[in-house]
From Swiss-Prot:
Methylated by PrmC. Methylation increases the termination efficiency of RF1. Its main location: cytoplasm. This is Peptide chain release factor 1. It comes from Desulfitobacterium hafniense (strain Y51). Keywords: Cytoplasm, Methylation, Protein biosynthesis. Pfam families: PCRF, RF-1. GO terms for cellular component: cytoplasm. Disulfide bonds: none annotated. The modification N5-methylglutamine is found at Q233.
Length: 355
């Protein structure tokens, strides 16, 4: 690990010099390329430099303890040695995590798809709860959200809702949300007060750029129709809604939320690109996935990952055995404790597999 860290630090210093070179400054695209590369190394280089300082002080303190010291000074040196040893171990762990191979999608924006599953209207209402939970979480992170497509039910739920979350590290934090979310509560329509169990499926896709997925226009069938609202009523007498079918894969995306046909087409293409990228990545990762099953989850949409129990005010993530008794705040977007626990578990698993 030490040799690798020294190489990274050397390259970081080279990039620092290049970024102040007048020729590089004059070439904006080259300067941006070097700046991005350097930014990706900053955390690990800072940790390594701090680690080097700690090790230096640790050796000095150990040297002091080998000399004859008065009892009070010796006690102080032993305490400092203990603190420095703890700090060194923490930094070693941090550097091992920072050296783990990075998911190439981690810096991408997210296209999130939420669909009502078993439970009829109650599942559709819960889909709305999850949509609000994720948009509030995004707001707390300083991210931007944009509705791409929605299919409403008569009482204000969603059969399906697709939206974009745009911001630094969005995919890295939200990727473990894919799967089946189960809700246990008494529906508002239930007169007997019985608890019902319903499910909603969440899919988290990294937003694909045009360079990530090449789509041949000849492979697309585009249908135009009038948009409709809850209960199928007509919202718009003009044909502004768009349905795009990618013929080779049979992937279909519809969008009708904008009044402009062009905007609906643009949004539908964004969702289509994300789905095609996911499909390609699933095929490429198929063999690896069968060899290594992560405790945090495979990202399979059919995997039950979390239960929201309203009578007990409880949220349980089944993958890591985490139970929190603060359902209300979680539904208000306070997801950090859950998300950080999932990220930590994933990192621990990857460290174990790298060992």
């Amino acid at each position: 690990m030490q040799r690798k860290l020294i190489e990274i630090e050397r390259r970081y210093d080279e990039l620092t010099q290049l970024l102040s070179d007048p020729e590089v400054i004059g070439n904006q695209s080259e300067w941006q390329k070097y700046a991005k590369a350097q930014a990706g190394m900053t955390d690990i280089v800072e940790a390594f430099r701090e680690y080097s300082e700690v090790v230096k002080h640790l050796e000095e303190t150990q040297g002091l303890l080998e000399e004859k010291l008065d009892p009070e000074f010796k006690e102080m040196a032993e305490l400092e040695l203990e603190e420095l040893t703890e700090k060194r171990d923490e930094l070693e762990e941090k550097m091992r995590i920072l050296l783990l191979p990075k998911d190439p999608n981690d810096d991408k924006n997210v296209i999130m798809e939420i669909r009502a599953g078993a439970g009829g209207e109650e599942a559709a209402l819960f889909a709305g709860d999850l949509y609000r939970m994720y948009t509030k979480y995004a707001e707390q992170q300083g991210w931007r959200t944009e509705l791409l497509s929605a299919s409403y039910t008569d009482i204000g739920g969603f059969k399906e809702i697709i939206f974009l979350i745009e911001g630094q590290g969005a995919y890295s934090k939200l990727k473990f949300e894919s799967g089946v979310h189960r809700v246990q509560r008494v529906p508002t329509t239930e007169s007997g007060g019985r608890i019902h169990t319903s499910t909603t499926t969440v899919a988290v896709l990294p937003e694909a750029e045009e360079v990530d997925v090449a789509i041949n226009p000849n492979d697309l069938r585009i249908d135009i129709f009038c948009s409709s609202g809850p209960g199928g009523q007509s919202v718009n007498t003009t044909q502004s809604a768009v349905r795009i079918t990618h013929v080779p894969t049979g992937t279909v995306v519809s969008c009708q939320d904008e009044k402009s046909q062009l905007k609906n087409k643009e949004k539908a293409l964004r969702v289509l690109r994300a789905r095609l990228l996911e499909r390609a990545q699933e095929e490429a990762m198929g063999e690896l996935a069968s060899e290594r099953r992560s405790q945090v989850g495979t990202g399979d949409r059919s995997e039950r990952i979390r239960t929201y129990n309203f009578p007990q005010g409880r949220v349980t993530d089944h993958r890591i055995g985490l139970t929190l008794h603060r359902l209300d705040s979680i539904l208000l977007g306070e997801l950090d404790e859950v998300i950080n626990a999932l990220i930590t578990t994933d990192q621990a698993e990857r460290l174990k597999s790298e060992a």
